[in-house]
Amino acid sequence: MPGKLPAEKRGSVSAAKHKSYYPAFLDLSGKKCVVVGGGTVAERKVRSLCAAGAFVTVVSPQLSRDLELLHANGTIQYIAQKYRRGDLRGAFLVIAATSDIAVNERVAKDAAGLINVADQPESGNIIVPSSVKRGQLVIAVSTLGASPALSRTIRKELETLYPAAVAAYLAFIGSLRKKAMSSIQSPWKRAQFFREIASGAMLDRVRQLGYRAVAAEVRTLFRRYERGEL
């Protein structure tokens, strides 16, 4: 068809309009992460990094009160100055979270590895999504910068959809899975059992009845599979 781009050209035009991202979870345990900025946005980033076990350094002339407390109790390291290029040395992950766009862009340019720029996702190479954590269940949501507000709205809906009881149920079936691997001999029956206890219907029962009631039902179900009744 006249005027129609070849497939490879169409793909490159599409890629030029929107970046493509690979969803992944990072293991930050013991890794050096540098946050440039000392305000409320930086504070949120620092708290999430610390929760992930990262070794966090904050670079900023000033700190919010909560960041000061984190520094005082030894949770974070603090470099009390305006950003300098050498501040990123050895960082596994860098987050630019100042209120100065020019500084954020300079940090992004200087970063040699992973870089997230708060409020300017297109300037970095990773996006930090909104997330819901229920024990070992982690659900991440991102609009790739199109609407952070919508990401937050969806996250709040997910928080309601997956209450704390789901975390307890997940821990329970996780431990039960190990027993089932040795107790239910048939691979087909074992897979059937796993599907049944992880079904949408079972999750609905957890929401309605609570973790303990459903766990009792699953234990009974497990014994029937063990005995070969199902």
Predicted features along the sequence, with ranges:
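Hydrophobic, well-ordered beta-alpha structural blocks that scaffold small-molecule cofactor pockets
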Residues: 2-71
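Alpha-helix C-terminal capping/helix-to-coil transition sites in glycosyltransferase folds
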Residues: 30, 89-91
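Short beta-strand and adjoining strand-loop segment in the mid-core
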Residues: 53-57, 91-100, 137-145, 158-160
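Short, conserved active-site loop motifs that form the nucleotide-linked donor/cofactor pocket
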Residues: 75-77
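Conserved SAM/SAH-binding loop
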Residues: 81-85
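ADP-ribose/adenylate-binding Rossmann-like module
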Residues: 93-99, 104-128
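Anionic-ligand binding region
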Residues: 122-125, 129-137, 152-155
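An accessory alpha-helical subdomain
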Residues: 145-230
